[in-house]
A protein has these predicted regions:
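A glycine/proline-hinged amphipathic helix-loop "lid/cap" segment
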Residues: 1-68, 309
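Short strand-loop-helix active-site module centered on a catalytic nucleophile
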Residues: 63, 79, 101, 122-189, ...
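Short beta-strand element of the alpha/beta-hydrolase
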Residues: 74-83
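Short amphipathic alpha-helix adjacent to the substrate-entry channel of hydrolases
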Residues: 92-111
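Serine-hydrolase catalytic core
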Residues: 222-277
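Catalytic histidine-centered segment of alpha/beta-hydrolase-like enzymes
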Residues: 279-292
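Catalytic active-site module of serine/aspartate enzymes centered on a nucleophile-bearing elbow/loop
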Residues: 290-309
């Protein structure tokens, strides 16, 4: 990749990816990811099990419970929402990362396969994510989970969902989370900050239309309004749990992640901001063995261990 930007040498081989341009291409990609993930998860058995939970509209949401060896109960838990521009199923590396969080932070991971746009626009997927948190609380005894040590987390679109869930948990149900793990989160659907234009040509999503992604997620033009929790930077962030916010230097979402971190700080929230020097969006998924990814994973796990206590 030729670029005047000082992208980390270990990330310069990352190629540009194009989101599927129509429903048939999207369906084909989803089927491929499902098949690859099914094969990939086999190596994790019996540490990963599948179940379903009921969302607010009675939809059955698949979730994966990752329980590391010798985990003591009651254990802390991370409820995790994967990225994928609100339209894509998780990548195999999402499960690899989730397994590392479970093993190295000594926690249960509840990995949520929420509903995706465009078939299911907001708030379907968001409600699925919130239902997973409520389910973890309601089934804590069976799961062996300590309800006082719950963290929500996610990357990219999943970071948006985690931030929105954290807001809703406190504002509507006074659920006191232990933390928020927000990895290059998409927290501002207006998408007008300088990094969007500055890094639009940087892989992996070279030339991606952030407005199109946002409107696909919403199911209508941005001009028609943005519902509560869909764009977390517009929400009330006071009294929220401590947050880890990760913003790669050359990510088009960099500025909104930093702005969200500052909003949290301004409201008195404990924030650990990790601006990944030389990083690009999704670097940990696309270059998992790079030193950049290893350093970021270490920071995330250290944050989890700290807030779990």
């Amino acid at each position: 990749m030729n670029s005047p930007l000082n992208i980390h040498p270990e990330l310069q081989s990352i190629k540009a990816h194009t989101l599927p341009s129509n429903r048939w291409a999207l369906a084909a990609m989803q089927n491929l990811l499902s098949a690859v993930n099914a094969m990939h998860r086999r190596k994790f058995k019996p540490l990963i099990t599948r179940t379903t939970i009921t969302s607010s509209d009675s939809y059955a949401v698949p979730i994966w419970i990752i329980r590391p060896e010798r985990l003591r109960s009651p254990a802390p838990a991370l409820v995790y929402y994967h990225g994928g521009a609100f339209v894509m199923k998780p990548a195999p590396q999402h499960f690899e990362n989730a397994m590392r969080y479970a093993r190295e932070a000594d926690c249960l991971v509840i990995f949520v396969e929420y509903r995706l746009a465009p078939k299911y626009p907001f708030p379907a997927g968001f409600n699925d994510c919130y239902a997973a948190l409520r389910w973890a609380l309601s089934n804590a005894a069976t799961l062996g989970v300590d309800t006082g040590r719950l963290v929500v987390g996610g990357d990219s679109a999943g970071g948006s969902l985690a931030a929105g869930v954290a807001q809703r948990a406190w504002q509507e149900d006074r659920i006191a989370l232990r933390g928020q793990l927000l990895i290059y989160p998409c927290v501002d659907l207006i998408c007008s900050r300088p990094s969007v234009a500055a890094f639009a040509s940087v892989p992996p999503f070279k030339g991606a239309s952030t407005v199109s992604i946002a409107e696909t997620y919403l199911g209508h033009p941005i001009s028609a309004g943005i519902p509560r929790y869909a764009s977390p930077i517009e929400g009330d962030v006071s009294q929220l749990a401590p947050a880890y916010v990760e913003t790669p230097e050359f990510d088009l979402l960099h500025d909104q992640g930093n702005a969200y971190a500052q909003r949290l700080i301004d409201k008195g929230v404990d924030v650990e901001l990790n601006e990944v020097k030389g990083g690009v969006h999704g670097f940990d998924l696309l270059a998992a063995n790079s030193s950049v990814s290893k350093d970021a994973m270490l920071r995330r796990i250290q944050f989890l261990r700290r807030v779990f206590g």
